[in-house]
């Protein structure tokens, strides 16, 4: 399992919270103190919280469950997409569409439409259309790519959400809560931890800090799914050996 350490988090500025006047009192137990009217997050709590979350993610990924990466603000968007793709997990990095979880039936129709347009763009259908029609379909496809491209292979509701900036992604968290889907979230000093099952106290604006969180989750997903695959191969080999040995035993 991937690990995070305090030194890397310090270097990345993960301990810097928001201005003290913007704090959320529900985060008080994670705050070490204040410096120049900026709250300082206690990284001695961040590290074990992160590792606990990674343990949970590992248990999901070992069973080939899906973790939906969510981070739509500018600082998180690129990292979320890159790391989710690297680890073979679904993601939302542009804008959360209301009902993405709670109205998944409708979202599935949009995914079908997106796949259809994708196929048309590759099989020469677009070339047979007028320039105007082709442009309209290309624009529709691009719009769908931004909104649901990251979940087109999810194949159903995710088994957990991993969220950067829980206040910014509150709609996603509420939908997950409604459906009983566990939420892992990076929570800053100005944010509300309610509705987050695995709270990771940390700066949710610094790009280097975001990279650490997201990379650790992606690495854990990759390692877990690879070890699960290796375990399956070993099981098959043992079964074959046993089958081959059976006649000799008679």
Swiss-Prot record:
GO biological process: translation
Pfam families (UniProt xref): Ribosomal_S2
Keyword match Ribonucleoprotein: yes
Gene Ontology molecular function, alphabetical: structural constituent of ribosome
Record keywords: Ribonucleoprotein, Ribosomal protein
Record flagged with keyword rRNA-binding: no
Any one Gene Ontology cellular component term annotated for this protein: cytosolic small ribosomal subunit
Protein family according to the UniProt entry: Belongs to the universal ribosomal protein uS2 family.
PANTHER family documented for this protein: 30S RIBOSOMAL PROTEIN S2 PROKARYOTIC AND ORGANELLAR, SMALL RIBOSOMAL SUBUNIT PROTEIN US2M
Name listed for the protein in its UniProt record: Small ribosomal subunit protein uS2
UniProt organism field: Marinobacter nauticus (strain ATCC 700491 / DSM 11845 / VT8)
């Amino acid at each position: 399992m991937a690990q995070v350490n305090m030194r890397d988090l310090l270097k990345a500025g993960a301990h810097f919270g928001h201005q003290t006047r913007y704090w959320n009192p529900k985060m008080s137990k994670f705050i070490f103190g204040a410096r120049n009217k900026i709250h300082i997050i206690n990284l001695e709590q961040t590290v074990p919280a992160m590792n606990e979350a990674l343990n949970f993610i590992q248990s999901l990924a070992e069973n080939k469950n899906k973790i939906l990466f969510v981070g739509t603000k500018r600082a998180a968007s690129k990292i979320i997409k890159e790391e989710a793709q690297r680890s073979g997990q679904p993601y939302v990095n542009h804008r959360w569409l209301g009902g993405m979880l709670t109205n998944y039936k409708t979202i599935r129709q949009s995914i079908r439409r997106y796949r259809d347009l994708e196929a048309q763009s590759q099989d020469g259908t677009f070339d047979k259309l007028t320039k105007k029609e082709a442009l309209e379909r290309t624009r529709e496809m691009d719009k769908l790519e931004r909104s649901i491209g990251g979940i087109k292979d999810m194949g159903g509701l995710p088994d957990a959400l991993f969220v950067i900036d829980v206040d910014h992604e509150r709609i996603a968290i509420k939908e997950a809560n409604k459906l009983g889907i566990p939420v892992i979230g990076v929570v800053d000093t100005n944010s509300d931890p309610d509705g987050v099952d695995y709270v990771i106290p940390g700066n949710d604006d610094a790009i280097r800090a975001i990279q650490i969180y997201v990379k650790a989750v992606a690495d854990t997903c990759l390692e877990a799914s690879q070890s699960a695959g290796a375990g399956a191969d070993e099981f098959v080999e043992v079964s074959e050996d046993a089958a081959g040995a059976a006649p000799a035993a008679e």
